[in-house]
Amino acid sequence: MRCSHGGALRPRGGNEGIGVRVSVIIPTHNEAQAIGRVLADLPSNLVTEVIVVDSNSTDGTPDLARKMGAQVIQEPRRGYGRACLTGLANTQNPDVVVFLDGDYSDRPSELPIILAPIIEGRADITLGSRFGGKSNPAALPWHQSFGNRLAAGLIRLLYGVKVSDLGPFRAGRADVLRALALEEATYGWAVEMIVKGAIAGFRIVEVSVSYYPRIGKSKISGTVKGTVGAAWFILSRIVRYSLRRRRAGTPRPA
């Protein structure tokens, strides 16, 4: 895969820890039970800003996030991808953008693992794989695990990206994310980032992260029916981008 950037990111006074500006985006919908723990566990010396994008929560999630110091943006329109895009549009000139769920299934304390390949200049996009770290087997039901592996296998086959999972804990250089012109408003957004990144020749690196049972009920994949629907949608998106890849290129940063 062609390398789009060379060398590590240059420090520019972003924070005390690494000198790089890091924005963390957390989509939420009724995550009052978990959001406090998520925000408390983020390494404050590595993070420049935290943006919680809330979609019509009725349990006080936005107020809790504000009390913890996060910037809260209300996004009434539904869609996981839409929430991520809204957060991205409201970042304040970051070098790196991290995406993290608000249910405490991922461990925010593992942020250094996600950031390292980008900070060190080895990657443009980093994906957290839930299949190689210290994960609780009960966190991913068999149908969700199977669907993720199937989609990841199709991406490997069609695009040559060494990926084993489509997990939500991920990061990207801000200039790369802007260049990809992401637009998917649903949970297909996770696939869009990988596929467009691969087509453009950006360096995509996967790292192992921990994964535990979420706090609260899953909005998408808690049932076999929900997982099948999500998997079918994601697989169709993977194939669609493959069919379109010869018609138009994806812009790259200068």
What does each of the following model-derived ranges do?
Residues 54-62:
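A conserved acidic beta->alpha catalytic loop
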Residues 161, 185, 195-212:
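Catalytic donor-sugar/metal-binding loop of nucleotide-sugar-dependent glycosyltransferases
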Residues 31-34, 57, 80, 107:
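Donor nucleotide-sugar binding loop of glycosyltransferases
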Residues 76-78, 82-90, 108-187, 213-230, ...:
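Acceptor/aglycone-binding surface of glycosyltransferases and processive sugar-polymer synthases
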Residues 21-23, 49, 192:
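Cell-envelope/extracellular polymer assembly enzymes that use nucleotide-activated donors
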Residues 94-105:
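Short beta-strand-to-loop acidic/aromatic patch adjacent to the donor-nucleotide binding site
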Residues 30-44:
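Short, well-formed alpha-helical segments that are part of the catalytic scaffolds
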